[in-house]
Swiss-Prot record:
It is found in: Secreted. The lineage of its organism: Eukaryota, Metazoa, Ecdysozoa, Arthropoda, Hexapoda. This is Tabimmunregulin 12. Horsefly salivary gland immunosuppressant protein that likely inhibits the host inflammatory response by regulation of anti- and pro-inflammatory cytokines. When tested on mouse splenocytes in the presence of LPS, it increases the secretion of the proinflammatory cytokine interleukin-10 (IL10) and decreases the secretion of the proinflammatory cytokine interferon-gamma (IFNG) in a dose-dependent manner. Expressed in salivary glands. Residues 25-38 form a propeptide. The keyword Secreted applies.
Amino acid sequence: MLFKSYVYFLAGLLLVGLFTSCDADAQYEELVPGFFRKGGVSGVGDYKPIVVFGKSFNQFEAAEGAKG
């Protein structure tokens, strides 16, 4: 019984090894196309100023203005 469990465990590791890769960045880039090219989470590449009543704000100034 213990030997059978060991064989199933090794077979599972083999299957996981076949479907995974050491190059994880390429896989994530395929899952989320353009995510890394646009600056990632921060969105630095997509910066656009916010225009309110003809005056231009960046997102931090707009957030501070909303608080006060």
